[in-house]
C-alpha cells in the first residue's frame, strides 16, 4: 500500500449528499477480485454516456479536474452496500483523499485499509474549500498528514484524525501489516497463555 505523508494535487467538488457505493462502483464491475481495471468503473453511469463516450458535463471529465487527487464530497459519502471495489477503483483512478463532513462507517474503514485519507471538516471550512474547488485556477491543495493540515492558496485548515489511522496511512500499512510488527509479543503471549492453561490446547473429544 502506498504511503501518505504529504500530497499535492487538484480537488474536484462532488457535493451531492448520500452518494452511495453503487454510484461510485456499479454492480457490473464487482465480478473480479484481482483489483485490475476498476478505475474504468468509478462513477461509470455518470462519467460515460449511453454510447460509451465521456460525459462532458461530469466534473471528472472537465479540463482542470480530470486528474483530481482529492474529492470534496457531500455528507454521508460512501453509504449503501459494503463493496471494497469502490475504494479500489477510486485508488486506481488516482484519488488519494476525500474531504467532507461525514462518511459511511464501513466505507471509511475501507478507505483507510487501502491508503485513501478521509478528512471530516466543519461546514464553514467546507464552504471555503468548495469556492476554491469550483475554479480550475484555484483548485490545487496540499494535504500534510504529518501536520494534519490542508493548505490552499488562501489559508491552512487543520483537521483531526486518530493517531492509529494517521500512523497506518503514513506507513502505508493495512491492519494485517500493522499487527505483524507485534508478532514477537503475540507469540510470547501465546506461549505464556498456554503454559498456564494447557487444557485449552487439547483437542476436543468426539461426541458419542
UniProtKB/Swiss-Prot annotation:
Catalyzes the isomerization between 2-isopropylmalate and 3-isopropylmalate, via the formation of 2-isopropylmaleate. InterPro entries: 3-IsopropMal_deHydase_ssu, Aconitase/3IPM_dehydase_swvl, AconitaseA/IPMdHydase_ssu_swvl, IPMI_Swivel, LeuD. Its EC number is 4.2.1.33. Belongs to the LeuD family. LeuD type 1 subfamily. This is 3-isopropylmalate dehydratase small subunit 2. It comes from Salmonella typhimurium (strain LT2 / SGSC1412 / ATCC 700720). The keyword Manganese does not apply. Pfam families: Aconitase_C (PF00694). Pathway: Amino-acid biosynthesis; L-leucine biosynthesis; L-leucine from 3-methyl-2-oxobutanoate: step 2/4.
Amino acid at each position: 500500500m502506498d504511503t501518505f505523508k504529504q500530497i499535492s494535487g487538484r480537488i474536484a467538488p462532488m457535493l451531492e449528499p448520500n452518494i452511495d457505493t453503487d454510484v461510485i462502483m456499479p454492480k457490473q464491475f464487482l465480478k473480479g477480485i484481482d483489483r485490475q481495471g476498476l478505475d474504468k468503473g468509478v462513477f461509470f453511469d455518470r462519467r460515460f454516456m449511453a454510447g460509451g463516450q465521456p460525459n462532458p458535463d461530469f466534473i471528472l471529465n472537465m479540463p482542470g479536474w480530470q486528474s483530481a487527487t482529492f474529492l470534496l464530497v457531500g455528507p454521508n459519502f460512501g453509504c449503501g452496500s459494503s463493496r471494497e471495489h469502490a475504494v479500489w477503483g477510486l485508488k486506481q483512478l488516482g484519488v488519494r483523499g476525500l474531504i467532507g463532513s461525514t462518511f459511511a462507517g464501513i466505507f471509511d474503514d475501507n478507505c483507510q485499509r487501502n491508503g485513501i485519507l478521509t478528512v471530516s471538516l466543519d461546514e464553514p471550512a467546507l464552504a471555503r474549500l468548495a469556492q476554491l474547488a469550483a475554479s480550475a485556477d484555484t483548485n490545487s491543495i496540499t494535504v500534510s498528514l504529518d501536520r494534519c493540515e490542508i493548505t490552499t492558496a488562501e489559508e491552512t485548515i487543520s483537521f483531526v484524525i486518530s493517531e492509529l489511522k494517521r500512523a497506518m496511512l503514513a506507513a502505508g500499512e493495512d491492519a494485517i501489516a500493522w499487527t505483524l510488527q507485534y508478532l514477537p509479543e503475540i507469540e510470547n503471549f501465546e506461549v505464556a497463555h498456554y503454559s498456564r492453561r494447557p487444557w485449552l490446547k487439547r483437542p476436543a473429544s468426539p461426541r458419542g
